[in-house]
From Swiss-Prot:
Pfam families: UPF0147
Highest rank taxon of the organism: Archaea
Family statement: Belongs to the UPF0147 family.
Organism: Pyrococcus abyssi (strain GE5 / Orsay)
Record-given protein name: UPF0147 protein PYRAB16980
SUPFAM superfamilies attached to this UniProt entry: Ta0600-like (SSF158436)
Amino acid sequence: MSDVEERINQIIQVLREQVVQDTAVPRNIRRAAEQAIEALMNKEKEPAVRAADAIAILEEISEDPNMPLHTRTIIWEVLGALEQIK
């Protein structure tokens, strides 16, 4: 497994464990995180394209006023990691 694929898998794990499975996070935000995970898992596209798709989804929800602060921080960290994927 390449370094990029390993990084993508780590990002998927963070989203799954800290956002999707957190019941304190509103449902629409968990759903967007699931969509970002699906975009990252799409092996038909290049890693950079998958990362860009996930960034678009996560940026859209990152300013949601209903998002808990700890979740917003996680989303920002994930966005930073995704932006490094080329």
